[in-house]
Amino acid sequence: MARLYETYKKDIVPKMMEKFQYDNIMQVPKVERVVVNIGVGEAIQNPKALDGAVNDLSIISGQKPVITRARKSIAGFKLREGMAIGCKVTLRGERMYDFLDRLINLALPRVRDFRGVSPQAFDGRGNYSLGIKEQTIFPEIDYDKIDKIRGLEVVVVTTAKTDEEARELLKSMGMPFR
């Protein structure tokens, strides 16, 4: 079992039961899934640009990404409906906890001038979004083998009803808020 999941079961659940006065253990919020997305704008002109992003994302997440396509055509961007413009991965279960553990304890501390993640990035429904400017903060990525520095978005979807509950859950998991 993942280390973060063990911590969640042993320490976080009892602490949150006490703090938010839940009647039932099933009411305690948990992380449902983590979606990692890379948008590759240059894939419009150069479809080969997507291969590097797919490769990076599969190394970071440990599973094969799905290629995302444009929903509608936008003439200003020379974009047609159905063109491949990025890739994403949805992590659940053990892989999700492993990824979160690596993100919180290894990757985020490697960001330059890092002072913590923004506490305002909750969506009002208990989900947290985080943008990462470069994929090189992950230890799995070999700096010499990358073709280009890319950013990625990480969305942590929780079962929390409010932002306050989700913030408490992520903070007790070790997410470094400012």
UniProtKB/Swiss-Prot annotation:
Q: Which PROSITE patterns match?
A: RIBOSOMAL_L5
Q: Which SUPFAM superfamilies match?
A: RL5-like
Task: Tell me a GO cellular component.
Answer: ribosome
Q: Name one GO biological process term.
A: translation
Which Gene3D superfamilies does this chain map to?
3.30.1440.10
* Single annotated GO MF: structural constituent of ribosome
Key words, A-Z = Ribonucleoprotein, Ribosomal protein, RNA-binding, rRNA-binding, tRNA-binding
Q: Which domain of life is it from?
A: Bacteria
Q: How does it assemble?
A: Part of the 50S ribosomal subunit; part of the 5S rRNA/L5/L18/L25 subcomplex. Contacts the 5S rRNA and the P site tRNA. Forms a bridge to the 30S subunit in the 70S ribosome.
Family as reported in the entry's similarity comment: Belongs to the universal ribosomal protein uL5 family.
Role noted for this protein: This is one of the proteins that bind and probably mediate the attachment of the 5S RNA into the large ribosomal subunit, where it forms part of the central protuberance. In the 70S ribosome it contacts protein S13 of the 30S subunit (bridge B1b), connecting the 2 subunits; this bridge is implicated in subunit movement. Contacts the P site tRNA; the 5S rRNA and some of its associated proteins might help stabilize positioning of ribosome-bound tRNAs.
Q: What is this protein called?
A: Large ribosomal subunit protein uL5
Q: Which organism is it from?
A: Syntrophomonas wolfei subsp. wolfei (strain DSM 2245B / Goettingen)
Gene name, per UniProt, is rplE
